[in-house]
From Swiss-Prot:
Entry GO terms, CC: cytoplasm
BP-aspect Gene Ontology terms: proteolysis
Protein name: Probable cytosol aminopeptidase
Active-site residues, record numbering mapped to chain: 269, 345
Binding annotation for Mn(2+) 2: 257, 262, 281, 343
Cofactors, names only: Mn(2+)
Chief localisation class: cytoplasm
Key word Amino-acid biosynthesis present: no
Naturally occurring in which organism (per UniProt): Prochlorococcus marinus subsp. pastoris (strain CCMP1986 / NIES-2087 / MED4)
One function term, GO molecular function aspect: metalloaminopeptidase activity
EC id: 3.4.11.1, 3.4.11.10
Top-level EC class: hydrolase
Manganese found in the keyword field: yes
């Protein structure tokens, strides 16, 4: 899907589908804006019949079969003094989602004078495109419905020079993440994930290194490889690098959990554990690769960015790791495995150590790590932990700009006692209470403490069972926009 703008005289506009935003005050004068395409007096009568006065979130649909304008969607924006971009994005998403299989091109005309910045308008474009997303790869039946392939913004006035290139790049990154998360585990294997990473490298000029099992053994990655032992599929350790063409002012590592399927191992997922949904246990790596795709196109100067994914499956066979085994991570720490279903943190242990050895200024890891974070924050908000107050502030700002909810959680040091082992340096899980916190405390043991670090648990946000805001039901691609915005803010 592409974005376009129309800045000419509206009387020359040739579109057939229009979304028109309207505030509560003085409907008659506002409707004059579209008098070029429809009799505004007649339209006002129809609107009054429906008792509509521009209330926030209310939507009116009109179909015209005997005019050039075929469809008109009117979105109520509420009082002009209280206009809210997030409300607009959600209403726009709702309209676009319902229209995306009926129209090939949709035009949008809002009271742009009430919008504060071009970034807000870009976010409207983002909302429109991402809400129209459909994934029919695994459906044998191909319908003949239309596909929305263009969003046009009319008369942007003071924002007439707006550029939607970066918006398109970010949407492409989110869409890649959604496709990866939604792909079934017999389709998205560790090998396939490495192929997808190689394609990103080829398309955008990134360097790539894929470590095979024997190379991971040489690096002492006993935690990551312990998880992979039960699968017939070889693990793939993926390292993408986006280099800067100018002197590097900051080096960053983004690390994603990459379990392409998680059975739970010998602590098998049963009952309400939703084993059939464990294809999305690589949501963190999907966000990292989606960010790599977007940033590879944007090419932020002065930054060297490393994208790291330890991809594997957690399965059961005669070689699989046992509950009670003691393993050694690549930083030399020994770990007693008291739960094979807490495998993501084991793969991240070696991935974080690897990232730390690159000597970055900061590391962010993303993972569908704990059910505890879903209990704490639900499905709309991800939790994050960090060892640096400035990083916390920067992430909150970036997530707010990106429209992805993020809530800071405590690194409660007293909870570390729950990870003590009688026979090893630590256990891989603590008690049930505070489970997402002890998971973060576990990860904190695997990188240089002088590095700024944040851990984002996206277990609740990477998937939605129903349409939610800009997300159609299914994979959300959560995390891509926040990561990209956080990087963009450093330019």
């Amino acid at each position: 899907m592409q974005f376009s703008t129309f800045q000419q005289d509206l009387n020359t506009w040739q579109g057939s589908s229009l979304i028109f935003g309207i505030v509560e005050e003085d409907l008659k004068n506002q409707l004059q804006k579209i008098n070029f395409i429809i009799d505004s007096k007649l339209l006002l009568e129809k609107i009054n019949q429906k008792k509509f006065n521009g209330e926030k979130g209310k939507i009116l649909n009109f179909d015209f079969f005997d005019q050039r304008l075929q469809t008109l969607k009117i979105i109520g924006l509420g009082e002009s003094k209280n206009i809210n971009s997030n409300d607009i994005k959600n209403s726009l998403a709702d309209v676009i989602r319902k229209s995306s299989d009926k129209e090939e091109k949709i035009s949008i005309l809002f009271p742009w004078e009430l919008i504060n910045s071009p970034e807000e308008i870009q976010s409207f474009g983002e909302s429109a495109r991402l809400s129209a997303y459909k994934d029919n790869r695994f459906n044998s039946k191909r319908d003949d419905k239309k596909v929305l392939n263009e969003i046009e913004f009319l008369n942007l006035n003071k924002f007439k020079n707006i550029n939607f290139n970066e918006t398109e790049y970010i949407c492409e990154g989110v869409e890649l993440a959604r496709r990866l998360v939604a792909a079934p585990p017999n389709s998205l294997t560790p090998l396939e994930m490495s192929i997808q990473a190689s394609k990103i490298a080829k398309d955008h000029g990134l360097e790539i290194k894929i470590l095979e099992k024997n190379e991971c053994e040489d690096l002492g990655m006993g935690a990551y490889l312990a998880v992979a032992k039960g699968s017939d599929l070889e693990p793939k350790f993926i390292h993408l690098t986006l280099k800067s063409t100018s002197p590097v002012k900051e080096k960053i590592a983004l690390v994603g959990k990459g379990l392409t399927f998680d059975s739970g191992g010998y602590n098998l997922k049963v009952g309400a554990s939703q084993i059939e949904m464990m294809k999305y246990d690589m949501g963190g790596s999907a966000a990292v690769l989606g960010a790599a795709k977007a940033l590879g196109a944007i090419k932020p100067d002065g930054l060297e960015i490393h994208f790291i994914v330890a991809a594997c499956e957690n399965m059961i066979n005669g070689s699989a790791v046992h509950p009670g085994d003691v393993i050694k991570a690549s930083n030399g720490k020994t770990i007693e495995i008291n739960n094979t279903d807490a495998e993501g943190r084991l793969t991240l242990a070696d991935a974080l150590t690897y990232a730390s050895n690159l000597k970055p200024d900061s590391i962010i890891d993303l993972a569908t790590l704990t059910g505890a974070i879903v209990v704490a924050l639900g499905n709309d908000v991800a939790g994050f932990w960090t060892n640096n107050n400035m990083m916390a502030s920067d992430l909150k700002t970036a997530s707010s700009q990106a429209g992805e909810e993020l809530w800071q959680m405590p690194l409660q040091k007293s909870y570390k006692d729950g990870l003590k082992s009688h026979i090893a340096d630590m256990k891989n899980t603590g008690p049930r209470a505070g489970g997402s916190i002890t998971a973060a405390l576990f990860l904190e043991e695997f990188f240089d403490k002088n590095i700024k670090w944040a851990h984002i648990d996206i277990a609740g946000t990477c998937w939605t069972d129903k349409n939610r805001g800009i997300h159609p039901s299914g994979a959300t691609g959560y995390g891509v926009k926040t990561l990209v915005q956080w990087i963009k803010n450093k330019r």
